[in-house]
Swiss-Prot record:
Homodimer and heterodimers. It is found in: Cell membrane. This is CASP-like protein 2D1. Residues 1-24 are annotated as: Disordered. NCBIfam families: A_tha_TIGR01569. Residues 1-29, 95-109, 173-193 are cytoplasmic. GO terms for cellular component: plasma membrane. Its main location: membrane. It comes from Arabidopsis lyrata subsp. lyrata (Lyre-leaved rock-cress). It is a multi-pass membrane protein. It holds the Pfam family CASP_dom. Residues 51-73, 133-151 are extracellular. The chain crosses the membrane at residues 30-50, 74-94, 110-132, 152-172.
Length: 193
């Protein structure tokens, strides 16, 4: 009798967890889609702020997007991330592609790492523009180009948000890719059994 009650309880738990599983997957899919869609306007704004950013100074000349190579890298990474985010959002709702979790996992991981390098490079550029580097005789430029520096700082802030979104997306896609597999067995448990 007692074994029968335990079996009934286990069946109830397993049936309720099976009912909750599609709801959890749907809410995860919605969060994933929202994050991916949020990347697009932030990346486009980063590109626009960086490319249209220019300022002239009568003493030092013109400073624009083409003057600093690291900004071209940031713009390129932003463009790639915006295009990928849009395409992956569309693909997320195509049933035959959703079952292929690796199609999302690998690019999400790669873009998270590439975004990290881009943010690091852009942060260094903004730091050098603000503080300079006396050892290599690079003077700070933000006192001469204040509008340029403030616009670039805003672009960097947006780029950092995109990085955080991609880091979170890489965790979600890793969960999707690896959740079908069983956890590794504990050798201590196997010995006791």
């Amino acid at each position: 009798m007692r074994a029968n009650n335990n079996n009934t309880r286990e069946e109830e738990r397993s049936s309720s967890s099976k009912q909750q599983q599609p709801q959890a997957h749907m809410s995860l899919k919605i969060i994933d889609s929202c994050l991916r869609l949020s990347v697009v306007p932030l990346s486009v704004a980063t590109i626009w702020l960086t490319v249209t950013n220019h300022e002239s100074n009568p003493d030092y000349g013109n400073l624009d997007y083409n003057s600093i190579m690291g900004l071209k890298y940031m713009v390129g990474v932003s463009a790639i991330s915006a295009i990928y985010a849009l395409l992956s959002t569309i693909s997320l709702w195509v049933t035959c592609l959703v079952s292929k979790a690796w199609l999302f996992f690998v690019p999400d991981q790669v873009l998270a790492y590439v975004m990290t390098t881009s943010v690091a490079g852009a942060t260094e550029i903004v730091y050098l523009l603000n503080k300079g580097d006396k050892i290599v005789t690079w003077s700070e430029m933000c006192s001469s180009y204040p509008h340029y520096c403030s616009k670039l700082t805003i672009a960097l802030g947006l780029h950092v948000f995109v990085l955080f979104f991609f880091l979170f997306l890489s965790v979600i896609s890793a969960y999707r890719a690896f959740s079908p597999f069983d956890p590794p067995c504990d050798s201590q448990t196997n010995i006791d059994a």
